């Protein structure tokens, strides 16, 4: 492990040299490439240097015990050794996690698709709850949320809402939200007070950059139509709504959120690119390993990953057996406790697999 860390540090120093080179500074492609690589390994290098400093201090403290010391001084050195041993062990564990191969999509923006599933109008209302939850969470992280497309129901729920969350590390946190989310509550229209169960599905796609996936204009069919509001009534007499069909894959995306056809097409292209990128990634993963599916973040949209029980103010994540009696807070966007637990479980599994 130490040899690997040393080579990472050497690479980091080499990248510093590159980024000071005028030839690189004047080449946007190289500058972006080297800056990203440096950013990806910076934390590992910083923790490695902390570890090395603590290890050197520990060695010096142990050497002091070889000298003739009075009882008080010996006790002080032993206490320092105990503290430094604990510190080096903590940093070593942190380095093991940092050396786990990273998901190349982790720092990307995400496109989130939330759809009401089983449960009719109640499922659509729950889809609205989830959209609000993710919007609040994004706001707390300092990220930006932008609605790409929404299909609103008569009661204010969503048959479907697609939105982008932009911010560093968005995919690393939100990728675990892929799957079916179940809600248990008494609908406002239920006079008998019976608890109903409904579901909404969530798909989290990393935003695909143009350099990562090549989409040719000739492969896209563009259809335009008039925008419509809840219930199908026309809200725009111009042909501003856009439907894009990627002919080779059959992926279809519609957007009518903006009044401008150009803006709708731009938004639709972002979603189309992300969906095609996600499709290729999932196909490649399935080909790589058809039988193995991780317990966390598999991306299986039919999987029931979490239950939101309103009468008991309870949220249960079924993948890791986590139950929290803070449903009200979680729906306000306070998702850290759930997401952090999922990340820790994912890291532990990867560490185990790496042994």
UniProtKB/Swiss-Prot annotation:
Its main location: cytoplasm. It holds the Pfam family RF-1. Methylated by PrmC. Methylation increases the termination efficiency of RF1. Keywords: Cytoplasm, Methylation, Protein biosynthesis. One of its GO terms (molecular function) is translation release factor activity, codon specific. It is found in: Cytoplasm. Belongs to the prokaryotic/mitochondrial release factor family. Peptide chain release factor 1 directs the termination of translation in response to the peptide chain termination codons UAG and UAA. This is Peptide chain release factor 1. It comes from Bacillus pumilus (strain SAFR-032).
């Amino acid at each position: 492990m130490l040899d690997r860390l040393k080579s990472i540090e050497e690479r980091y120093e080499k990248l510093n040299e590159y980024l000071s080179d005028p030839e690189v500074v004047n080449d946007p492609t190289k500058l972006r490439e080297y800056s990203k690589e440096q950013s990806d390994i910076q934390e590992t290098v910083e923790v490695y240097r902390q570890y090395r400093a603590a290890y050197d201090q520990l060695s010096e403290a142990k050497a002091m015990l070889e000298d003739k010391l009075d009882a008080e001084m010996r006790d002080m050195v032993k206490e320092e050794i105990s503290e430094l041993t604990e510190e080096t062990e903590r940093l070593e564990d942190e380095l093991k996690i940092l050396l786990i191969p990273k998901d190349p999509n982790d720092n990307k923006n995400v496109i989130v698709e939330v759809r009401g599933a089983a449960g009719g109008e109640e499922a659509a209302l729950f889809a609205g709850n989830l959209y609000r939850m993710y919007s609040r969470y994004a706001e707390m992280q300092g990220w930006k949320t932008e609605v790409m497309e929404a299909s609103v129901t008569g009661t204010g729920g969503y048959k479907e809402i697609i939105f982008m969350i932009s911010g560093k590390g968005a995919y690393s946190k939100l990728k675990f939200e892929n799957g079916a989310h179940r809600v248990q509550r008494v609908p406002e229209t239920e006079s008998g007070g019976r608890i109903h169960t409904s579901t909404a599905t969530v798909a989290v796609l990393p935003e695909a950059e143009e350099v990562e996936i090549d989409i040719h204009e000739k492969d896209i069919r563009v259809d335009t139509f008039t925008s419509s509001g809840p219930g199908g009534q026309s809200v725009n007499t111009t042909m501003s709504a856009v439907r894009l069909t990627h002919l080779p894959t059959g992926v279809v995306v519609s957007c009518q959120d903006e009044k401008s056809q150009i803006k709708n097409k731009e938004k639709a292209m972002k979603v189309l690119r992300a969906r095609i990128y996600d499709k290729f990634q999932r196909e490649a993963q399935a080909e790589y390993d058809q039988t193995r599916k991780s317990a966390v973040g598999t991306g299986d949209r039919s999987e029931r990953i979490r239950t939101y029980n309103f009468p008991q103010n309870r949220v249960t994540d079924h993948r890791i057996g986590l139950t929290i009696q803070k449903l009200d807070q979680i729906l306000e966007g306070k998702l850290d406790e759930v997401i952090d637990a999922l990340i820790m479980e994912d890291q532990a599994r990867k560490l185990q697999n790496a042994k």
